[in-house]
Amino acid sequence: MKLAKKWRDWYIESGKKYLFPLLLVCFAVIAYFLVCQMTKPESYNVKLFQVAEKTIRSPQTVEDTEKTKEERTKASDAVEDVYVYNRETGQNRVALIQSLFAYVNEVNAEAQEKDTKNKEKAKKENKPAPAPTSTEDKLKNLKDKLSSNVSEKITSNISDEVFTTLIEAKSKDFNVMEDVVTTEVEKSMENKIRDENLNSVKIRARDDIELSAIPAYYKNVSKALVSYAIVPNEVYDEEQTDARRKEAAQSVVPVKILQGQVIVQEGQIVDRETYRQLKMLHLLDQKMPVKQYAGFAIFIIALAAILFLYTKKQTQPKAKKMQTMLIFSSVYLVSLFMLFIILFLETQNIANIAFLFPAAFAPMILKILLNEKYAFLSVIFIAVTSLLTFQNDATSGITIFILLSGATSVVMLRDYSRRSAIMLSGFMVGLINMIYVLLLLLINNSTLLQVSTLMALGYAFLGGFGAFILGVGVIPLFETIFGLLTTSRLVELANPNHPLLKKILMKAPGTYHHSMMVANLAEACADKIGANSLLVRVGCFYHDIGKTLRPPYFVENQLQGINPHDRLTPEQSRDIILSHTKDGAEILKENHMPQPIIDIALQHHGTTLLKYFYFKAKETNPDVKEADYRYSGPKPQTKEIAIINISDSVEAAVRSSTEPTMAKITEIIDGIIKDRFLDGQFTECDITIQEIKIIRDTLIATLNGIYHQRIQYPDDKD
């Protein structure tokens, strides 16, 4: 995953400049290489498992690299892994736990001393006794001490709940915990612990804690501490292991085939080993005619040109076109490689193995990642390629099968928001593949009641169903590498039980409700203008997650009559409000959310002005800069974010309105849209004036339905 992330980062930052022309070159070269390999003619002189017509000797002395490698691998594998036991690791972990308990004692003692002094001082001055030091202050003090004097990692690896429990523990219980946990860590670390048995040691330690004298309330905390403290103390020494294995491998004498050595005698059966040696000595090579090489080159160039011209016609940004071509070519090349494997299996005389080819793999993936048109295009590409590569009597039948199977997968795959629906489509494609094979066998007047027919049907089903299984497994890899956001991933993110959504609900319920309302408004607008409504809805769910860091400072989370901004300067309030977009983007990045969701959190306010605090600051400082009170942006880069930009402001403004009549709602919406236009907030995305008009009308209709005036019925008096 780290490699995929590095690739994606390079692709986002630099790849857009260089990858577009390089894409076609790589696509053409690799495809050309595979096609040439698949169509390379077989030798007619020597065949596997057949009798050699004459004695063949080695024309030269060469190293049998495969045999040498095999022997060296055996020698290397025979060397056992080297592990180094470090006793100091155990001592250090015990000392770490002891330090933790010591600092908890120290923090409590300091707090007690401070509270005593404060009480005495207040008593002398005839003032009310001040509140004792809070647990939060003690927790901060403890974490500062641990970070400074022990390790910064300890505060990030042990939860605040554990620290708080230790701070608040009674002296007697605390001492019991300290004794038992320290003893358990010391006892556990006396064992030789590797990564393989680390979990079992931790489980045993936690079981000991469960049976210990520690009060039940503190057992989970104690278990957490021993789990953190117990680490491997016998570490795999990669350097020594590699050195010993390298030494063992190098000690192996290279296996050689000597000049004049008999490879196969006349009349002898050519087995796999003999055949391999003949290939290694290039005694089976039979070059293709130059015209054939040229023909394949023209074929690949034609495919690349079709893909290029078709993609060029699409109304997409250049970077998006590049990504589309890269995805298409990658999937095509994977299919080509699968075709290569099937052709190899054919050389092993496995009857009807061609029907095992997963023709549905490429169209299934491309329909989910791109669209239906690219899926059908891949079917044509693969079918035409198979026409060139399957060089036997059944070539046309296999090509027709691939064409039908691929097209069927595109038609059958309708609901791909759920994995179960995808797998059901794959099962249906497998069954339909069996029908296609039966039809082809009937057309060829083949005998149906034989084992090879049953095998062909089985291969056809496995090829269809297996293609979908492979596709489901590969799609997350494409999502990671290219930063894609598929429908299934969006549905997953829309689940109310997602940890981040639960976090918003628990920490900022007002923001959660606001986000749901904005999602309903924005989704309706996206549907009307043909934008990605699911992306808009899910993006709204997470767009204000940055507010969870300081919920009370945002109006929707404030209790009636309590506004913490009353105690702050405009500058302080500005910093808190403006930071929620960046904070949200950071939270989403830390949780490995897709880039489009991160972009929504970062861009949903664009570079708009925080007017209230700007004018408030201007009252005391006329020279205040407007730029200092604008969001850092960037401005919305897509029409989906532009929709959220408008809907977010409209929802907040209408909700704060005392009388949201239809006239008032219309006035608010028109004012916000006009303000955004005059401020140039939509200059960097592809949204049109006509689309904004549709958004306006949709917002008016939707909000009027929510806030419409109800008929007031008179009270029913007896």
Curated annotation (Swiss-Prot):
Question: Could you list the residue ranges that cross the membrane?
Answer: 18-38, 290-310, 325-345, 350-370, 371-391, 393-413, 422-442, 458-478
**Where does the record place the region Disordered?**
112-140
Output the SUPFAM superfamilies linked to this UniProt entry.
HD-domain/PDEase-like
Identify the residues that bind Mn(2+) 1: H514, H543, D544, D648
Any Pfam family from its record, for instance, is HD
Family classification: Belongs to the PgpH phosphodiesterase family.
Query: What does the record's free text say on domains?
Result: The cytoplasmic domain (residues 494-718, expressed as a maltose-binding protein fusion) has c-di-AMP phosphodiesterase activity.
What protein is this chain from?
A: Cyclic-di-AMP phosphodiesterase PgpH
Organism of provenance: Listeria monocytogenes serotype 1/2a (strain 10403S)
